[in-house]
Structures are given as C-alpha cells and as structure tokens.
UniProtKB/Swiss-Prot annotation:
It comes from the Bacteria. The lineage of its organism: Bacteria, Bacillati, Actinomycetota, Actinomycetes, Micrococcales. (2R)-2-phosphoglycerate binds at residues 163, 335, 364-365, 386. Keywords: Cytoplasm, Glycolysis, Lyase, Magnesium, Metal-binding, Secreted. It comes from Pseudarthrobacter chlorophenolicus (strain ATCC 700700 / DSM 12829 / CIP 107037 / JCM 12360 / KCTC 9906 / NCIMB 13794 / A6) (Arthrobacter chlorophenolicus). This is Enolase. HAMAP family: Enolase (MF_00318). GO terms for cellular component: cell surface; extracellular region; phosphopyruvate hydratase complex. GO terms for biological process: glycolytic process.
C-alpha cells in the first residue's frame, strides 16, 4: 500500500499566459504524480469556483497563489497518510474540508490539481498507465477527435458568432488515421484562407480565426478544405459546432448574426443547418438556463444530431440528472475543472453513459502540457475528445498521448469512428 507522503503545489502558466495550479504528490514508495489544472474562457455560471487572487498588481489579478497556499497549508496536512488508491475517500476528504457547494473556499483549481496528481501517482505506484489504472482491462476505445479548426466567438476576435467549428474524422479505421485526416484538412483550410485573402491568425485553441460574413461561410470553407484534402464531407469527415450561446444571450434574446432571436428561431436555424450540412454534433446551442428551449430543441432534432450540454450540465451529476429526467440534450461534455474532482467527473460520465447519453472528454481554452484528459477519455471509453486544433503544443500533447495509447493497446484498440455518433444518418 502506497501512502501519501507529501503534497506540493506551485503557480505555472497556461497556454494563454495566465497563472494556473500545478500539484505534485509524493507517495511512500517514492512515486510522484503531477497534474496541472486548465482554465476556460467561456465558463458556465454553475461551474465550480476557480480561485484567483484578485491582486491587480500581480498577474492583473489572475494569480493563483491563494489556491497554491490552500493545497500546501490545508489540503496537504489533511491528506497525508491516505492510501493513494482510495481516490473516492481522498476526493471526499477535500470536499468536506472545503465545505461549500461550489468549492469556493479552497478552490476547484486546488482540489482538482490534487485529485488528478493523486491518480497519476497511484497509477505510477501500480506500474500501470493512467488510462488502465482508471479504466481497467476494458479501457480500449480510442476517441474520435473533434478538432476545432476554425474559431469564432470568445475564442477569436472576429464577427463569427459560433465559437468553434470542428471536424470529426468518422470514416477512419484507427485514431492515428483519423488524426492524420484532420491534420491534412487543417493545412488545406489554411491554404483556402490564404487563397481568399483571409487571415490565418490562430484563436486560443489553435484554429484559424478569419473575419467571415456568416457562420455558414465558415462551414462552407471547411467543406471546401475537406474536399481539397481528398475526403468526402459526411462520409469520411463530418462537421461539429460549439455555439457557446450563453456568450451572446442578452436580455432574454440571442444576439445572433445581427438580430435578436428567440429560442424557437434559433432552433429553426439549427434545423436548417442539420438539413444542409453533415453535422454530427451541436454543443451549447441554447443558453445554460434556457431549459424550456433546450427541451423543445431536443424534441425537434435530438434524433438527428448530438446535442451537447456543456454550460448546461457543467459536468455536474446532479444537474445532468435533471437533463436525463426531462430528456433534455443527449450528450455530456466532460470537463474536469467544471466539477473540480476526478471522482465527481467519473460519476458524471458513468451516469451519462447509463442513460444513453454520449460523452465527450474536453480540454479548456486555457490549457497546459498535461495529458491527463487523454487517458481519462480512453479510461471511460468516452468515444469522443475535444482538445483543439492539431497545432500548439498544449493541444498536440493530448493527441500525441492518444497515439501512444493506441500503439500500446495494439490489437485491443478500437477507434470509435462513426459509432460514436449513433444519431447521425449522413
């Protein structure tokens, strides 16, 4: 039995140049686990609290020294001596120590950093890769990458309302092949943008961020890039969206493409998109508090396309249960820092899968070189992963880890492919 011997935390930088928390856990057998915590740009109002210092004279108020201190001064003494493999008890001890419903005392960034570092240390102690330690012998499904190759919304400085335009290589036989297809489309998209005199500057997640006249124009450009790369839209590579509609929901209406639209008008717009394009997934199509609109949309097109709750569910099992009970949405986006502990994350995934909801393991726009989510994706057989464009090392690190996992699994590896999107009839 390996016990927790020491826990240390430090302030490091994420991919946006903002501070974040990194934690190291030392076990009694000498093994060390490390984890770094991501941070989002478009955040749901029901997410667990990310503790920031608020000192404008240091990192413009975005320092995380309070969270670091919480790890060192409060969490570390409380967890010393715990069996590192008892993840649920460790996470519960931190929740009890925090004592708030949203982790507002210690900070979700402090709790999550420790939670993930413990898992990494325990896996090392067991001499197992993290995906196998968490998922056991049945962890073998490699996810379809939802690759964010064109950015709008709060991830880019442009007139495009939708935050992420993604490609999904559903026709590939293996993860490595799917990744290659995505990379080829990404580079072809750059060529298309250059030919049209459009910007090839990058957004937060590595996707291009040109100033386009409409959201449909973005989809058309991507389809052109898919064809130029030698692939067939809908057969080889499908499209997916993250609308992040809470970002443009103001005064009871959706401020979209220069108009103030109702939920029913937005739903009609999405129905047209699903009819006109090979769309397999739409994330956060409506505001996180517009449950009535979400239900109507699910009833209307939920049998044709994956409707993903990100801000709607914030990886929270209690909120997800409401969605399941009311048959609202049909997919869960899984972000470890939304809920703030590994145990709660795995509980949410398990609940979703039992209810027939698809699951997508996801990064945040502020990322680090930490690859834990790649292992979580395989551990849970999630079937899909969002971790940005095939550019910028903090994104590519996750793809490279999945390549390693696929190689290690060898003949046991199965690529989710088209089966990850059971509602898509394209």
């Amino acid at each position: 039995m390996a016990l927790i011997d020491a826990i240390h935390a430090r302030e490091i930088l994420d991919s946006r140049g903002n501070p974040t928390v990194e934690v190291e856990v030392l076990l009694s057998d000498g093994q060390i686990g490390r984890a770094a915590v991501p941070s989002g740009a478009s955040t749901g109002e029901h997410e667990a609290v990310e503790l920031r210092d608020g000192d404008k004279g240091r990192y413009l108020g975005k320092g995380v020294q309070k969270a670091v201190d919480a790890v060192i001064d409060q969490i570390a003494p409380a967890l010393t001596g715990f069996d590192a493999t008892d993840q649920r008890s460790i996470d519960q001890a931190m929740l009890d120590l925090d004592g708030t419903p949203n982790k507002g005392k210690l900070g979700a960034n402090a709790i999550l950093g420790v939670s993930l570092a413990v898992a990494n240390a325990a896996a090392a102690s067991a001499d197992l890769p993290l995906y196998k330690y968490l998922g056991g012998p049945n962890a073998h499904v490699l996810p379809v990458p939802l690759m964010n190759i064109l950015n709008g919304g709060s991830h880019a400085d442009s007139d495009v309302d939708i935050q992420e335009f993604m490609i999904a290589p559903i026709g590939a036989e293996t993860f490595s092949e799917g990744l290659r297809w995505g990379v080829e489309v990404y580079h072809n998209l750059k060529s298309v943008l250059k030919e049209q005199g459009l910007s090839t500057g990058l957004g937060d997640e590595g996707g291009f961020a040109p100033n386009l006249p409409s959201n449909r124009a973005a989809l058309d450009l991507i389809q052109e890039a898919i064809k130029n790369a030698g692939y067939t839209p809908g057969k080889d590579i499908a499209l997916a969206l993250d609308v992040a509609s809470s970002e443009f929901f103001k005064d009871g209406a959706y401020q979209f493409e220069g108009k103030a639209l109702s939920a029913s008008e937005m739903s009609a717009y999405y129905a047209e998109l699903v009819a006109d394009y090979p769309l397999v997934s739409i994330e956060d199509p409506l505001d996180e508090n517009d449950w009535e609109g979400w239900k109507t949309l699910t009833d209307a097109i939920g049998d044709k396309v994956q409707l993903v709750g990100d801000d709607l569910f914030v990886t929270n099992p209690a909120i997800l249960q409401r969605g399941i009970d009311t048959r609202t949405a049909n997919s869960l986006l899984v972000k470890v820092n939304q809920i703030g502990s590994l145990t709660e994350t795995l509980d949410a995934v398990s609940l979703a899968q039992r209810a027939g909801y698809t699951t997508i393991t996801s990064h945040r726009s502020g990322e680090t070189e930490d690859t834990t989510i790649a292992d979580i994706s395989v551990a849970t057989n999630a079937g899909q992963i969002k971790t940005g464009a095939p550019a910028r090392s903090e994104r590519v690190a996750k793809y490279n880890q999945l390549l390693r996992i696929e190689e290690e699994l060898d003949d046991a590896a199965r690529y989710a492919g088209r089966s990850a999107f059971p509602r898509f009839k394209g």
